[in-house]
Amino acid sequence: MANIKSQIKRNLTNEKRHQANVSFKSSYKTAVKAVEKAVEAKDKDLALAKLSFAHKKLDKGQAKGIFHKNFVARNKSALARLVNSL
């Protein structure tokens, strides 16, 4: 347990950011599952719409510092390949 006032405040801030980051990552994973489900159903229009949303989530995550740029590039590429396989 921290004794210094500023560290106590930092711990609270860190916990809030951690919860926000976990929530964001969860929403990204849900978006990926939606793309995979649309591809499995062979619905190209829906898959493209879901792909756009997933790319948006990845880009926003990179801008916020939640995702590394290589992670974003790798995942965007993999999702695009998946949708283009239709």
UniProtKB/Swiss-Prot annotation:
Region (Disordered), start-end ranges: 1-20
InterPro entries xrefs: Ribosomal_bS20, Ribosomal_bS20_sf
GO molecular function: small ribosomal subunit rRNA binding; structural constituent of ribosome
Keyword field: Ribonucleoprotein, Ribosomal protein, RNA-binding, rRNA-binding
Polar residues compositional bias, start-end: 1-11
Any Gene Ontology CC annotation: cytosol
GO biological process: translation
PANTHER family associated with the record: 30S RIBOSOMAL PROTEIN S20, SMALL RIBOSOMAL SUBUNIT PROTEIN BS20C
Summary of the function given for this chain in its UniProt record: Binds directly to 16S ribosomal RNA.
Sequence similarity: Belongs to the bacterial ribosomal protein bS20 family.
Name of the molecule in the record: Small ribosomal subunit protein bS20
Encoding gene per record: rpsT
